[in-house]
Each structure stands twice: as structure tokens, then as C-alpha cells.
Amino acid sequence: MQRREFLTLAGAAALGGCRSLCPFGCGASLKEYDDTLRDHCWMWGHDSGFYDGTGKASVYNIPLSDPISMPDACAYMGIPNVCAVTWNPPESDEYLEPFKKMKRVSWVACGGNNTFETLEANCWRLRGKLPNLMGFDLDDYFTYQPKPELFDTGKGVIKVAPSKIGHSKLLDFRRRIDERAAGRIDLRMVIYADYLEDTYAPALAVPDTVLFWTWTGKNLAKLRENFARYRALAPGKDTLLGIYMWDFGGRKPLDMDFMRKQLDVAHELYMKREINGFIFHCTPLVNKKPALEAVEYAREWIEKHADDKRG
């Protein structure tokens, strides 16, 4: 990756255990990816019923289906890495056990209705339980309000896009990661293509990796242009490109022309090393009957390009 060198994880015994469980063959360093496209694929994970349930969960019009775990959904898609999003910290070791079969795991550290302090504490707790945990994800970090935060850098006051925890707490979180897990945990932050003003640049400079998403299907028509705008804010930043398989902004199945376009652009950006990989959204979409066309297209695309290598 571009921002800093990959460092190996400590704890040979723990990693040895990871190797024995991992169907994708965990190596000595979770932050070192192999040269195949598949190894650079992630999947955004939610428990079943989060987006495809009843009541508030039905707002996006996603059809109901039988439950499927995040690791099982990833296995179906042929994806080795998962970003787990659980707003209530899991208490059961039995729940966590299947995640040990993934090559890499990241866990949500911000967003939802739970406090940042609760979610951060859970991330640190999980480090002792998941030897393949290598990322803390700031989901829904920004509040996307028009009035910026005024932050005193000590050399002057700057305008920063408003967030759920504030810029000072973000910097403190960065310091804690550097002190407790330097080179072993990536701090990762979500940003959407709809919000690319200059005030977002100070926050985007803090994480190791940015997760770039296009919420509304029709906006994928301008994916290249929007990604270029993002790059102007965060040049050289390690970036995973989010691949939605449902039109959440439109609350409907994703138009297949847009699905094909976003994967064509994603492949182009990846091969040019403008992005580091992909995040497919999301695990509750995987087991629909009939299957969602965008999901099956993505699955076939991953299989087709799994062994692609960049020059």
C-alpha cells in the first residue's frame, strides 16, 4: 500500500491457528495481499434481517429470505475478507467462531445508534479473539450537515466536515491505534460520492484506508468523475471501492447497466493501481430466491477475474 509499508503481525502461534482454519490460506501478514484480484476483494457484512427484515429494516424494499451468516455469504461469493457491521457487540464466542475462517476481518468502530466508545471497546476486545482482525471501520462517520466544525490545529483554525465524534476524537483514536497496534490494525473510513467538498480532506487524511461508496444507482453514471474528485481530496490514499449490489438510494434492484459499469470502472481503476481493492455490499443480499441478478453477476465477475494480476 502507498501510505506506509505493510508490517507483519506479531504472534506466530495465533497466525498459525488462523492458517489452519482459513480456507483461503492466511499468510504471515494480514496486511500483505497476494497478487491476485480475489485476495483484494472484501464483503460488507450485516446480520440477516438488518436490511431485509420487517419494520424499519424493510425501508429499502429488499425481499425477505432465510438467514445467512456473513462468513457463509462470503464463501458463496468467493470473497476471502469481510467487514463486519454489528451495532450491538457480539457476546458469544460461538457467533465469532465462523469469522476465524475468513482470511481478513475488519469490525465497525463508529456508526449506528451505539456510542463510539462502546464500539471502539468492542474492537479492542475482539483483537484478543480474532487473530485475523486487521481493521477498524468508521462507518457513517460523517453527519453530512452543512455547517463545518472549526478545529484548532495549534497553527490556526481549519474547517472540517462535521462528524459523529468530532475531529479531536478521531485524532485521539488514530493515536491509540498507533500506540497499541501500529502496523497491525488499519483505521478505515467511509465516504460517499455525494459529499466531496474540501472540508472532508482533513478527516480523510487521518485513516490508513478510505472506503469510497456510491449510494444511489443513477450516480454510477459519473463514477469516474466522482472518483477523480475524491482523489483530489485524498491523493495517494489507500482506497477500497464500494460495489453496491442493490440501489439503496433508489430503494430498488440495481439497474444492470449500472452494475456492469461500476465493475468495468472498478476493474480499470484496480489494474491501474488507483484503488487497492473492492468491497461488495452486502451479505444479506446473497441468498434471495430468486437470486438477485446483480449479486449473481458480481459472483461470476469475481470468478472470471479472480486470478487477474496487475503489472
Tell where the protein language model's regions lie, with residue ranges:
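N-terminal export signals
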Residues: 5-25
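Glycan-processing catalytic domains of CAZymes
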Residues: 29-311
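N-terminal secretory signal peptides
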Residues: 1-2
